[in-house]
């Protein structure tokens, strides 16, 4: 099993380095939060006959890196597995068992539904929060200027 835990911008570089070593039985997944775009990119460059089954564990925090690792990071957290028309069913089964073994609850959906759901529940609130902070900062600067 290979789990991509890197930024999406690194996927292509990594796949091109490992492509010749991949076997049809190799289970490849990722833990990114954007699925449609990543799956589209991966399909274009992944060697024929190799299956990619995307995962999205809904766990973590605002900090990253191994120094912030937690023993029970996935305990009782959702992990979304992405199932498309050509997804290898055996890989879905193995990944489902894997994520459950580390404590996750597993749900399965297609990439379009995933990205729609998470753009509204995760990405949109972040965008609103960033804009709120910027508006407050700009307002504070304007108030200083007027004083």
Label for each model-derived stretch:
Residues 5-7, 32, 83:
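Glycine-rich, N-terminal phosphate-binding loop of Rossmann-like dinucleotide-binding domains
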Residues 71-147:
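Internal alpha-helical scaffold of NAD(P)-dependent oxidoreductase catalytic cores
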Residues 1-3, 29:
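N-terminal Rossmann-like NAD(P) cofactor-binding module of classical short-chain dehydrogenase/reductase
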Residues 3-5, 59-60:
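Short acidic/polar alpha-helix capping motifs at helix-coil junctions
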Residues 14-66:
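Rossmann-like NAD(P)(H) cofactor-binding subdomain of soluble oxidoreductases
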